């Protein structure tokens, strides 16, 4: 989503609160909880889940391994839920032609660097760069090339933009910033 006027362009960036992350977190939580309950029921020799009789699963080694997988899955699931609740990666890109400043803001993980803010002068922007990698895992990423600082990604690598969409976005941004476009 973006908002544009004659002098200001604000591009909102979606973070980790995506439907796919919610789905993976739920699937991982339920699956790992099932593994952990089966491991515990094999240890207690009692049916905690009625689908699998605990007599069929011996605690050592199957129940122990399933308990380990369940705990590992719960840790990964809790990590996913934390990134979703903190909305890591969300933010905005603000291009202000009137003041000649570009602000790139992102939310990070809690701590000292929770708020990530880059302020750049528009005169330091060399170009808008499109990086295209075709093949099985095709990806197209839009970068802003800065003098002395390298390239700053403006789109996420998991955004599946079509070639037409990425070209249009790059052309509009390059026209707004009055810089050339490079394709790699």
Curated annotation (Swiss-Prot):
For this UniProt record, give its keywords in alphabetical order, as a comma-separated list. Answer: Chloroplast, Membrane, Photosynthesis, Plastid, Thylakoid, Transmembrane, Transmembrane helix
GO CC terms: chloroplast thylakoid membrane; photosystem I
- Residue ranges annotated as coiled coil are none
Indicate whether Glycoprotein appears among the record's keywords.
no
Q: Which spans are transmembrane here?
A: 22-42, 57-77
Q: Which domain of life is it from?
A: Eukaryota
Q: Where is the protein situated, by its record's location annotation? A: Plastid, Chloroplast thylakoid membrane
Q: What is its main location?
A: plastid
Its GO biological process terms? photosynthesis
Q: What is the membrane topology listed in the Swiss-Prot or TrEMBL record? A: Multi-pass membrane protein
Its biological function? Seems to be required for the assembly of the photosystem I complex.
Q: Which family does it belong to?
A: Belongs to the Ycf4 family.
Name the record gives this protein: Photosystem I assembly protein Ycf4
Its lineage reads: Eukaryota, Viridiplantae, Streptophyta, Embryophyta, Tracheophyta
């Amino acid at each position: 989503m973006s908002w544009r006027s004659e002098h200001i362009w604000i591009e909102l960036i979606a973070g980790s609160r995506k439907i796919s992350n919610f789905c993976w977190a739920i699937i991982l939580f339920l699956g790992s909880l099932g593994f952990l309950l089966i491991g515990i029921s094999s240890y207690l020799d009692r049916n905690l889940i009625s689908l699998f009789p605990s007599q069929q699963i011996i605690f050592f080694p199957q129940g122990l391994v399933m308990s380990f997988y369940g705990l590992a899955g719960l840790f990964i699931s809790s990590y996913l839920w934390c990134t979703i609740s903190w909305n890591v990666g969300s933010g905005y890109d603000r291009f202000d032609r009137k003041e000649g400043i570009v602000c790139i803001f992102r939310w990070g993980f809690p701590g000292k660097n929770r708020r990530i803010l880059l302020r750049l002068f528009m005169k330091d922007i060399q170009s808008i760069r499109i990086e295209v990698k075709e093949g099985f895992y095709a990806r197209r990423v839009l970068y802003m090339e800065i003098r002395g600082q390298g390239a700053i990604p403006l789109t996420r690598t998991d955004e599946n933009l079509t070639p037409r969409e990425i070209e249009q976005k790059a052309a509009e941004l390059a026209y707004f910033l009055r810089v050339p476009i490079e394709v790699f």
